[in-house]
Amino acid sequence: MRVLGIETSCDETGIAIYDEEKGLMAHTLYSQVKLHADYGGVVPELASRDHVRKIIPLIREALKNADTRIEDLDGICYTKGPGLIGALLVGACVGRSLAFSWNLPAVGVHHMEGHLLAPMLEDEVPEFPFVALLVSGGHSMLVKVDGIGQYEVLGESIDDAAGEAFDKTAKLMGLDYPGGPRLAKLAASGQPANYKFPRPMTDRPGLDFSFSGLKTFVANTIAAEPDDEQTRANIARAFEEAVVDTLSIKCRRALEQTGYKRLVIAGGVSANVRLRAGLAELMEKLGGKVYYPRGEFCTDNGAMIAYAGLQRLKAGQLEDLAVKGQPRWPLDTLLPV
């Protein structure tokens, strides 16, 4: 089976061709970072319009790069949610329309399931069951995964997600958009142990996250300290260490609660070097193993949507003719495969 994958949930247009036997044959990605930079964040209307401009040329490019004709395709997979409704509808309209005109089955894919399954695109794939830490700009959650579609959310963010906290803190520090990667780069030159920031919600039982208070703590620290490059770097490092420690503590609890020895980390924040190192150290202590996608598949992309969608097409979970987007869509409501 060979499918076309379409991702348009936020500010990246991702297209991919995935074959069940040959693997990933082609993927193209267009990022709108420059478009939104002047606004300090994603402007939904601008994002939707840019998806409209880019999606068809990118589909043509992916088909060409994969040496794939329309008649070679067995289905179309597009992100149905969660995400920005306008952006979602661009991908849904194009994906469902192409499927109808080409007489192909279609499936709407859960964006976070795409992230969760992104490590399956690598040479070394995690076996079920495992615990997944999904960390992105819009989501932070720990999920017990017993199979595709067999998900139990163990904990999630009750306010700011980890990626959102990175971006907002970067903005407080005067860093340009996108702030998260810039803050991590600044933190690399920071000195350890200059500041001690709280590890939110680690002093009580449970697996939920909360990063809004940490962001406020950082804001107060910035206001009270000198405004020089080294001080900013030290604050950035202390913030990053606080987030990484918090995520690591929660992951340990989730692994102990489930008894699992495999940890998957995915989503945009999973590209963070300090987080990867911290979780690798944790899993070594626990006698387990951590899995994550390569850098290009940590951010939103069409490859993960193509892979996740193919699994559901094989299970016969097809989309009807209606074009739908779901800006909110609980992960644990998905059907098992």
UniProtKB/Swiss-Prot annotation:
The keyword Lyase does not apply. It is found in: Cytoplasm. InterPro entries: ATPase_NBD, Gcp-like_dom, KAE1/TsaD, Peptidase_M22_CS, TsaD. Its main location: cytoplasm. One of its GO terms (molecular function) is iron ion binding. Belongs to the KAE1 / TsaD family. This is tRNA N6-adenosine threonylcarbamoyltransferase. It comes from Shewanella amazonensis (strain ATCC BAA-1098 / SB2B).
